[in-house]
Each structure stands twice: as structure tokens, then as C-alpha cells.
């Protein structure tokens, strides 16, 4: 499954005194099996971009093509329904949208609307919940008797229960404790590597971006100003400063180390493990 943006612009309240162009002339592509991160300041157009992915918003100008379905501002909703079945959208604080009295009913709500096999959906959701640290009897419990972090994880899996090909998540770990953050991010990564799903992550956490993403899209004032690998992105401190994007902690540690010892390691370390490996290699060659 491939999603392609061709010269996509979106204007809120078009034709009124309050009109605002949130994104303009966006050209990009998302492929199944890859992990994307979208970064940028608040108001840079990230949320508008992802809402155009599954036609929650339709382009004011330009086209969004999902496999063989082309979406314009004129496309009727009946033609978009197959797209929405294959693209799972997890917005910020999704736990606020929980409403069923048991986890099981929450899990089958989406699959039921799309006339999917409910037993398969329940089994798939149960496996994902177990991966997130829930007990075996979680399906019979009420989500409203759980902690905020548990409710967040329940809400995320309720979208994943539809087994979408592309998963879009907007700040999924905001406010979670460290263990829950790791569980959620590792689950998303496993869905990419083990099930060939595309993950599209909006995040302000550059540590997550560095560790998990294959490609990073940088947005500024409604435009894509960069689309590259994390290693290439974090090499250019001047551009990062211009885009108001911070460095991951491990990359900052590497730059501090290189400055202190007046040296240059052979590569950019995106994880603690990679930094240790580069450090040992540097020590060996001293």
C-alpha cells in the first residue's frame, strides 16, 4: 500500500475572513513497511497533513492517492470508506474517546462498523494487549476502572484491532510513564518489522524519532522542508536550530564527547548501544 501526496494544499475556512492555509504544495510518499516520523513546531502543519492521509480532511488543491484511489476536494465519502478501513488513526489523548463498558466491546466497535470478522479482531487485539503488559482477563474488564496510562493503551489497541496496513499516531506516548512509553513504541516497531505495516508518527520526542524512524519529515510553516534519514537529519545542527528541533539526548552526548576530546566518531549514534560501540572502536584506535 502506498500513499502519495501531489501538490497538496489545505485551507481552513476557505472563502471567509478567517481562512488559513495550513499546508501548501506538499509532495511526499508513504510506503508500506516503513517507519516515518513527522516533526516540527506546533502549528507547522503536522496534524493537518496526517488528516489528509485518510481523507478526514480533503485537499483544497492537489491530490492524495491511496493505491488506486485518488482523493480530491470533490471526492465523495462513499469512495473513501475503503481507505479508512486500511489506515488506522490514533489522535492525541485517544483515551478520551473510550465509551464502551468493557475492553472487549471497545475492541470490536471499529471492526463491527467495517463488517470484519469479530473473532479474528478480538484475538488480534488480545495479543496486542498482552504485548502491552495486560493480564489475560483484560477483555472482560471496564476501561474506566483503569489508570490513565492503561486507558491510553486500550484506546490505541482499539484502533489497531482493525488490523490496518498503515498506522498513524499523534504523540502516542505523551504523558505516559517510561515503561508504558517503551511498551507502546516497541509494539509499533514490531508491527512494522513483523507485519510489514507502515507507521507514521508525529512526535516532539527526538529520542523516539532517532531510535525508531526510518525517515523523518520536517515541517515548517505548512511545508515539508526536509525528508531524510535520522542520521542525516541530526548531522546538521544549524538547520535543526533554524527549524527549532532539538537533538536526541544520545546525539547531544556524542557531540559533547567529540568537542571535549577534539575527535570525531565514525558515525552518528542514534541509540545508547550504537554510541557504546562507536566509543569502543574509538578507544581501540587511539
From Swiss-Prot:
EC number: 7.-.-.-
Membrane disposition: Peripheral membrane protein
One Pfam family this sequence matches: ABC_tran
CC terms in the record's Gene Ontology section: ATP-binding cassette (ABC) transporter complex
Subcellular location: Cell membrane
Keyword line: ATP-binding, Cell membrane, Membrane, Nucleotide-binding, Translocase, Transport
Gene Ontology molecular-function annotations: ATP binding; ATP hydrolysis activity; ATPase-coupled transmembrane transporter activity
SUPFAM superfamilies per UniProt: P-loop containing nucleoside triphosphate hydrolases
Domain of life: Bacteria
Domain ABC transporter as annotated: residue spans: 3-246
Binding site for ATP: 40-47
InterPro entries the UniProt entry points to: AAA+_ATPase, ABC_transporter-like_ATP-bd, ABC_transporter-like_CS, ABC_transpr_CbiO/EcfA_su, ECF_ABC_transporter_ATP-bd, EcfA2, P-loop_NTPase
Function per UniProt: ATP-binding (A) component of a common energy-coupling factor (ECF) ABC-transporter complex. Unlike classic ABC transporters this ECF transporter provides the energy necessary to transport a number of different substrates.
Family: Belongs to the ABC transporter superfamily. Energy-coupling factor EcfA family.
Complex formation: Forms a stable energy-coupling factor (ECF) transporter complex composed of 2 membrane-embedded substrate-binding proteins (S component), 2 ATP-binding proteins (A component) and 2 transmembrane proteins (T component).
Name assigned to this protein: Energy-coupling factor transporter ATP-binding protein EcfA2
Amino acid at each position: 500500500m502506498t500513499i502519495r501526496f501531489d501538490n497538496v494544499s489545505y485551507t481552513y475556512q476557505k472563502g471567509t475572513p478567517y481562512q488559513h492555509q495550513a499546508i501548501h504544495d506538499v509532495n511526499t510518499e508513504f510506503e508500506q513497511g516503513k517507519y516515518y516520523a513527522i516533526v516540527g513546531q506546533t502549528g507547522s502543519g503536522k496534524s493537518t497533513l496526517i488528516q489528509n492521509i485518510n481523507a478526514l480532511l480533503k485537499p483544497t488543491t492537489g491530490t492524495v492517492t491511496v493505491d488506486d484511489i485518488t482523493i480530491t476536494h470533490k471526492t465523495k465519502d462513499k469512495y473513501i470508506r475503503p481507505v479508512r478501513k486500511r489506515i488506522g488513526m490514533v489522535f492525541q489523548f485517544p483515551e478520551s474517546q473510550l465509551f464502551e463498558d468493557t475492553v472487549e466491546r471497545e475492541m470490536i466497535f471499529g471492526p463491527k462498523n467495517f463488517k470484519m470478522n469479530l473473532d479474528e479482531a478480538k484475538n488480534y487485539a488480545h495479543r496486542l494487549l498482552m504485548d502491552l503488559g495486560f493480564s489475560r482477563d483484560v477483555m472482560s474488564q471496564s476501561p474506566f476502572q483503569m489508570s490513565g496510562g492503561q486507558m491510553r493503551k486500550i484506546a490505541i489497541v482499539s484502533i489497531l484491532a482493525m488490523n490496518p496496513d498503515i498506522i498513524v499516531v499523534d504523540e502516542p506516548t505523551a504523558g505516559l510513564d517510561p515503561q508504558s512509553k517503551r511498551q507502546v513504541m516497541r509494539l509499533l516497531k514490531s508491527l512494522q518489522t513483523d507485519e510489514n505495516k507502515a507507521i507514521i508518527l508525529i512526535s516532539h520526542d527526538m529520542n523516539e524519532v532517532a531510535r525508531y524512524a526510518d525517515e523523518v519529515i520536517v515541517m515548517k510553516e505548512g511545508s515539508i522542508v526536509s525528508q531524510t534519514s535520522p542520521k542525516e537529519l541530526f548531522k546538521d545542527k544549524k538547520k535543526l536550530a533554524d527549524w527549532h528541533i532539538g537533538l536526541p539526548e544520545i546525539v547531544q552526548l556524542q557531540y559533547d564527547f567529540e568537542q571535549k576530546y577534539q575527535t570525531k566518531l565514525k558515525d552518528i549514534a542514534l541509540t545508547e548501544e550504537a554510541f557504546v560501540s562507536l566509543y569502543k572502536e574509538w578507544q581501540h584506535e587511539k
